[in-house]
Regions:
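Bacterial N-terminal signal peptides
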Residues: 11-19
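Short hydrophobic alpha-helices and adjacent helix-cap/hinge residues
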Residues: 2-7, 11, 26-323
Length: 323
């Protein structure tokens, strides 16, 4: 009996030792914190692309790296708490998805490397001194879209459009930048614009309903708050039978009409490769901001049918049914 108890004690000690060694090994793995402003198709795709690129290169959560993903639900207070959490955990790298995420994180640490994605203009957002050499602990990928071509798409699909409604969030630097550019391209195309901004998701319904009464088409940049509320905008536009032209494909899947934009999944993969470089010792302050150079049409045939908009023959190959 004593022999059995002794063997059991030895077995228990060995088990605890192996568990402790495993835990210690896990703690030695590089820790990547991911902070995402809000859930919507574009930001989710960027995150998926980032993680897939890491996985394909052998950086697997729980095996060769650790990943701590947090979503701020569009709340500045939650963003701040997430940043504090990552600093307390002494993460090795942060992926900040969307401008506000990167700004909050960068405002709290000058030492932890921060890679951004789904950010339009790092310099305007005061995240970098220049795109060529950021100069701070922040680099990443930009989601700047071909805005001039997107405005041209309005003319191509709805040639009788005389006025365009701009709907975006006033506190999102990325949206402000794109709206400023869009205003110039709209006027250059011989159209007028009407602008309504929102502060949060609660404002979207009233803003959308106001705009559709005044314009022939809507244009929405890659705006996170509005993107997360696309079904509301869709409902308002369908009621007045006007098209919604958007900054990215995720907004089309949410109820928009058409876009020519980047792939956020590919943007995330591009950011993942940058993360591998940073984990390998690259100096993030000298890593140029990267961008996508290929753009894709996405046309919502379901929406076009609802509002009676004919899709030009040359764009039919890009038309999809959206449930």
């Amino acid at each position: 009996m004593r022999t059995l108890k002794k063997r059991m004690a030895i077995l228990l000690a060995l088990t605890l030792m192996l568990f402790a060694l495993g835990a210690a090994a896990g703690e030695d793995l590089p820790l990547i914190g991911i902070v995402q402003l809000v859930e919507h198709a574009a930001l989710d795709a960027a995150r998926d692309g980032f993680l897939d690129e890491l996985k394909d290169q052998g950086y697997i959560d729980g095996q060769t790296i650790r990943v701590d993903y947090r979503n701020a639900q569009a709340s500045p207070d939650i963003l701040s708490s997430i940043a504090d959490h990552f600093i307390g955990e002494e993460v090795d790298l942060v992926l900040a998805i969307a401008t506000n995420s990167a700004q909050t994180m960068a405002g709290k640490t000058e030492t932890i490397p921060i890679l951004g994605t789904a950010i339009t203009d790092y310099v305007v957002a005061k995240l970098a001194k220049s795109n060529e050499e950021p100069g701070y602990n922040v680099s990443g990928t930009t989601d700047m879209n071909p805005i001039e071509q997107q405005i041209a798409l309005i003319r191509q699909m709805a040639p009788d459009t005389r006025s365009v409604g701009l709907l975006y969030t006033s506190s999102e630097d990325n949206s402000v930048t794109q709206a400023r550019m869009a205003r110039g391209f709209i006027e250059a195309a011989g159209m007028q614009y009407v602008e309504v901004t929102v502060n949060n998701a609660n404002d979207v319904q009233q803003a959308a309903q106001s705009l559709v009464e005044q314009v022939d088409a809507l244009y929405i940049p890659t705006d996170n708050i509005v993107a997360s509320s696309m079904p509301i905008v869709h409902e308002a536009a369908v009621a007045k039978k006007i098209p919604i032209f958007c900054g990215e494909a995720g907004q089309i899947l949410g109820g928009g009409t058409a876009t020519l934009g980047i792939s956020y999944y590919n943007l995330g993969r591009q950011t993942g490769q940058m993360a591998i470089d940073v984990l390998g010792g690259a100096d993030i302050s000298t890593m140029p901001i990267q961008s996508q150079t290929q753009f894709e049409y996405t046309i919502n045939k379901t929406m076009c049918d609802l509002i009676g908009l004919e899709i030009p023959a040359e764009l039919l190959p890009f038309a999809i049914e959206v449930p």
